[in-house]
Amino acid sequence: MSVAGLKKQFHKASQLFSEKISGAEGTKLDEEFLDMEKKIDITSKAVAEILSKATEYLQPNPAYRAKLGMLNTMSKLRGQVKATGYPQTEGLLGDCMLKYGRELGEDSAFGNSLVEVGEALKLMAEVKDSLDINVKQTFIDPLQLLQDKDLKEIGHHLRKLEGRRLDYDYKKKRVGKIPEEEIRQAVEKFEESKELAERSMFNFLENDVEQVSQLAVFVEAALDYHRQSTEILQELQNKLELRIALASQVPRRDYMPKPVNTSSTNANGVEPSSSSKLTGTDIPSDQPCCRGLYDFEPENEGELGFKEGDIITLTNQIDENWYEGMLRGESGFFPINYVEVIVPLPR
């Protein structure tokens, strides 16, 4: 910094100290300017908090948000274009219902109903994905641009104005000790900064209908999401009511006890249970899992390490390259090409 620059910084600091500690009064700006400045300050705070809350509205689980951020960063580093999507709660519940509905089979009324509800929830998850994309593009991104460009520029003008105001007030109180030319230049710079800040705030506040338009687009997207979800649920409700009506017309069967087959009992007259036949390496047939083909050492936070031959419980497929699973009470991500799937995840 030049000598002149250091001198100016000293003037500002000295004037600020005088105002804060000694109670000296600085140059007052007009009420209209102060009113605009207050509205800009409130708008800046509103935009910052709305951006945060809008993201929570679309993706309420902070752990999943952090996980997605890490995975998408890793994908970018690997040169992968496709980003990992947020796992919608409707989709997760739908997967669960589909899995057990199919296991119960088509001869089970409850199983068939689980499949129908699961498929409907999967459709709702797709609609929610569309809402996420729509709101991000038409509401969150424009607000982010507003914060990063317009409000940032206004903030720059206001900070510059305050600096020049302090410099001007310092020199104004030292008339006779400071050359008149310096005071005149300080006045000109102060007035120039005030005009720039005033014009930028005025133009922003006069065009705030743009933000109203963005809110309208957000509401329209939310309305469309709820409209489509209502249609899906209404159709599902009709199916379930029809299934209940048909089930009430089917005659109930009487329970008929079956004779016990004693041919396979052991010496004590007790048939071995299925659980007693399992060894420590047996895998439940209904539990999605995989076996490690190679040792995998985690390099990043959130990754799950394992050894060759380890049996890992599968909980989710993140993308075409990564699984999420559990091993010995720990959960994390690991590459698909390091394992052999034994029981696949439900589709």
Curated annotation (Swiss-Prot):
Residues 255-284 are annotated as: Disordered. This is Endophilin-A3. CDD domains: BAR_Endophilin_A3, SH3_Endophilin_A. SUPFAM superfamilies: BAR/IMD domain-like, SH3-domain. It comes from Rattus norvegicus. InterPro entries: AH/BAR_dom_sf, BAR_dom, Endophilin-A3_BAR, Endophilin_A_SH3, Endophilin_SH3RF, SH3-like_dom_sf, SH3_domain. It holds the Pfam family BAR. Cells overexpressing Sh3gl3 show inhibition of transferrin uptake. Olfactory epithelium-derived cells overexpressing SH3GL3, DRD2 and GRK2 show accelerated differentiation upon addition of apomorphine due to reduced agonist-induced endocytosis of DRD2. The keyword Transferase does not apply. Residues 285-344 form the SH3 domain. It is found in: Cytoplasm; Early endosome membrane. An N-terminal amphipathic helix, the BAR domain and a second amphipathic helix inserted into helix 1 of the BAR domain (N-BAR domain) induce membrane curvature and bind curved membranes. PROSITE patterns: BAR, SH3. Disulfide bonds: none annotated. Residues 60-87 are annotated as: Required for dimerization upon membrane association. Residues 18-249 form the BAR domain. Belongs to the endophilin family. GO terms for molecular function: identical protein binding; lipid binding. Residues 218-254 are annotated as: Interaction with ARC. Residues 1-21 are annotated as: Membrane-binding amphipathic helix. The keyword Membrane applies. Residues 180-201 form a coiled coil.
